[in-house]
Amino acid sequence: MRTSSLPETRRDSAPVRLMTYNIHRWAGRDQRLDLDRLASIIRDAGADVVGLNEVLHPVTMNGRTYAPLAELADRLDMRYAFGPSGWLDYGPGWHGPVGNALLSRFPLRDATNTLLPRLPSSKQRSLLGAAIAGGPARGLTAFVTHLDHAFEGTRLLQIQGVLKRMAQHGPHFLVGDFNTPGFMGRNTRLLLPPVLRLLAAAGYQDAFCAVGNGPGRTFPSHSPLVRIDFLFLPLRWARGLRSARALSGNVTYQASDHRPLVVEWAWPQGEALPA
């Protein structure tokens, strides 16, 4: 005899805080690797899931090899996943595999790293994804990427690869440094670059554009002029967006050349739990 049960639905789901943060190769604006500083920013923001860009893992400094990603996760009591894009020689005696990372208060599973399309003259970029397997974000897949810094045409090619990869998934969100200036006000809505127009056409909502507080500029951290760090959700799941803001403060100014973006989100009312 076969039995079945109705899908569980989410009612008054607890919110989760999602963060995207380019950590500038572990080097603050003062060129120091300061894990206490980074940990305090993430902890004070109450972040549950964090997408990191420009992560070296492991990193060799002055002949010694360190694993700051693992140590940062340990300090925050978080799990982590890393997806390399290539190799970086940041400076004399400072080098290692570089890419994106995820930190999560909840278990992560099925982490995958996808190398994105590129032009012959451009650096390799990647997309890291992992399923969140516990807590109020269970059933959500987190993706983090870092697009080319030089040319919108290259970024457009890369985001097409991102969209193709994410199309295989159910509920998910995408964060990262897109190196593409975002919507900053009513008069710029029609001037969105092709990358952001393509995401909108594919049915993705820019979280800050929907529920953002304050100016939202993320770069450069000491005197931000543009918003190039984003969180996107498919429109179906974007109904759960509650707030978005770029962090500020003296510690944030020194910790990286970017400001982190923090978004609060909950499962939309009545959505069924993924199997």
Language-model segments: which ranges?
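N-terminal, active-site-proximal structural segment of metallo-dependent hydrolase catalytic domains
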Residues: 1-78, 82, 87-94, 269-275
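Beta-strand-turn-beta hairpins that frame and shape the catalytic cleft
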Residues: 5-19, 96-100, 104-109, 122-144, ...
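Active-site beta-strand/loop signature of hydrolases that rely on acidic residues for catalysis
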Residues: 17-23, 38-64, 103, 130, ...
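Soluble or luminal CAZymes and related metallo-dependent hydrolases
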Residues: 30-37, 64, 68, 122-124, ...
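Alpha-helix termination/capping residues and helix-transition junctions
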Residues: 44-46, 105, 136-139, 168, ...
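Active site of divalent-metal-dependent phosphoester/diester hydrolases
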Residues: 61-65, 78-102, 121-123, 179-255
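Short loop/turn motifs that cap or connect beta-strands within the blades
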Residues: 114-117
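A short C-terminal boundary segment appended to hydrolase-like catalytic domains
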Residues: 245, 249-275
